[in-house]
Amino acid sequence: MATPQRRPWLALFEPNIPGNFGAALRLAACLDVELHVVEPCGFPLDDRRLKRAGLDYAAAAGLVRHADFAAFRTAAGREVRRLVLLSTKASTPYHRFAYRPGDVLLAGRESAGVPDAVAASCGAAVRIPLKSGLRSLNVVVAAGMALGQCMASQGLFPGDAERGDEEGDHLDE
């Protein structure tokens, strides 16, 4: 399994829907990746609400909070991590992108994405191709798709190293 420094991070930029935050927390916990939240959030983010939003996954998730984008950028830069923005405006499809160990997948605010300055500071941007005429996916659905592609391309799913590629886990019903 990849060392913690080389596992991807999932990052949410100023999320404003608590249910999406909870889903991202669960996604991060189940896939054993850190969830970084760039504040301010559009909802109070205290211990009681964290527990409620993340159900029983809050304790298993590696949640890291950043006061603002500058603080987040400093943390990612300390570990020499590339920021990969998930954007409807990107030209590169997420499934044709060359992910690297330690990439940070950054999802924008549900209502507005990220400011141009944040987008410009990212090392890459990817999009999920959609049916013509439709705008976007739910932010956590998009993040899950991109994170899955990133992890699959590097053999980073929990158990991959022990199991090899012979067989995978089946979805629980």
Residue ranges and their predicted role:
Residues 1-173:
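Post-transcriptional modification and biogenesis factors for structured RNAs
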